[in-house]
């Protein structure tokens, strides 16, 4: 069975978290993986990172790393200095993940998270693409040395103009042309951008390195209108054996609610107890589909 995880900001409304607390929580709930934003790792010394990794190992929890790249480190930016700073920033994150013996780093890694402040037409999108690929190839020199796969996540049009679909993710990975570039798909984003989620999964096929689940409105899978039979049957068809991490965002407020654009509590009265109950429902829901499709 695929290892199953949950994104820590299901509970936490800050990107900076109490790692041991949430490691223990997801272990008690029965998950295999805790995923969180990677950028706070840059502020933690290596000894403490190794202690966090040991705590996770002792709890039987795998750690997974994600990122929405701050625009001030935009590796696709027209400004040479911004791109160079972004390359160094991503390389340093890869090094920190390697300290924790991490294998994979995903998310909006290829450009600043969000829509650029300047106009993007078809010609500018090609220039964005070329600049990003050149930058990512420099990141790959460190990723290959450290043995960390960096995934490009196809996200919706409101979060990036560069990689919105599975086909665009494939084109990007082909251009970077490294053993350490991967493709990351997310059902929330695919629901917005793809004509068929199942076809998008099949198009990526064996190149799919990371997979996020979330409902049409950022809710817990099973609480919205996505066709989970279509999704899991496609994953089974391509023989997907890698991690599946759920990434619901249910709470408004603070930096996470603002950055994700959650303008209401999607779960009414989201106390920690209610969130824990939803996390338990989510785990059972996902395991049910894995069993149904022999995964």
Annotated model-derived regions:
Residues 1-103, 126, 178, 264-295:
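N-terminal pre-domain/capping segments
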Residues 1-12, 16-29, 163-182, 191-295:
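Histidine-acidic metal/acid-base catalytic patches
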Residues 3-5, 33-35, 60-65, 102-106, ...:
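Structural preference for beta-strand elements that scaffold enzyme active sites
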Residues 10-12, 38-40, 69-71, 111-113, ...:
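Active-site-proximal loop/turn and secondary-structure-junction residues that shape catalytic pockets
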Residues 17-18, 46-47, 76-81, 118-126, ...:
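Short, solvent-exposed loop/turn segments at secondary-structure boundaries
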Residues 26, 34, 56, 86, ...:
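Conserved, mostly hydrophobic/aromatic
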Residues 47-60, 135-143, 200, 230-234:
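Catalytic-core regions built around general acid/base machinery
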Residues 57-58, 80-182, 269, 273-276, ...:
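Active-site acidic/histidine proton-transfer and metal-coordination neighborhood
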């Amino acid at each position: 069975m695929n290892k199953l995880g949950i994104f820590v900001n299901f509970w936490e409304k800050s990107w900076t978290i109490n790692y041991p607390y949430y490691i223990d929580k997801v272990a008690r709930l029965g998950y295999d993986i805790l995923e969180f934003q990677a950028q706070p790792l840059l502020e933690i010394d290596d000894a403490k990172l190794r202690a966090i990794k040991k705590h996770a190992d002792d709890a039987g929890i795998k750690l997974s790393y994600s990122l929405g790249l701050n625009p001030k480190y935009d590796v696709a930016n027209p400004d040479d200095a911004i791109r160079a700073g972004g390359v160094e920033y991503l390389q340093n994150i890869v090094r920190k993940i390697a300290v924790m013996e991490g294998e994979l780093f995903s998310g909006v890694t290829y450009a600043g998270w969000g829509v650029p402040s300047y106009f993007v037409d078809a010609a500018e999108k090609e220039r964005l693409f070329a600049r990003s690929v050149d930058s990512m190839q420099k990141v790959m020199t460190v990723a290959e040395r450290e043995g960390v796969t960096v995934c490009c996540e196809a996200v919706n049009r409101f979060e990036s103009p560069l990689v919105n679909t599975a086909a665009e993710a494939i084109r990007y990975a082909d251009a970077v042309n490294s053993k350490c570039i991967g493709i990351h798909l997310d059902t929330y984003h695919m629901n917005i951008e793809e004509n068929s989620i199942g076809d998008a999964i099949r198009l990526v096929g064996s190149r799919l390195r990371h997979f996020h689940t979330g409902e049409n409105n950022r809710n817990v899978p099973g609480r919205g209108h996505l066709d989970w039979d279509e999704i899991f049957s496609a994953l089974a068809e391509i023989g997907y054996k890698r991690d599946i991490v759920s990434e619901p965002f249910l709470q408004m407020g603070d930096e996470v609610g603002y950055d994700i654009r959650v303008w209401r509590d999607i779960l009414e009265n989201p106390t920690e107890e209610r969130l824990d109950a939803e996390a338990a429902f989510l785990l059972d829901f996902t395991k049910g589909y894995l069993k149904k499709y022999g995964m």
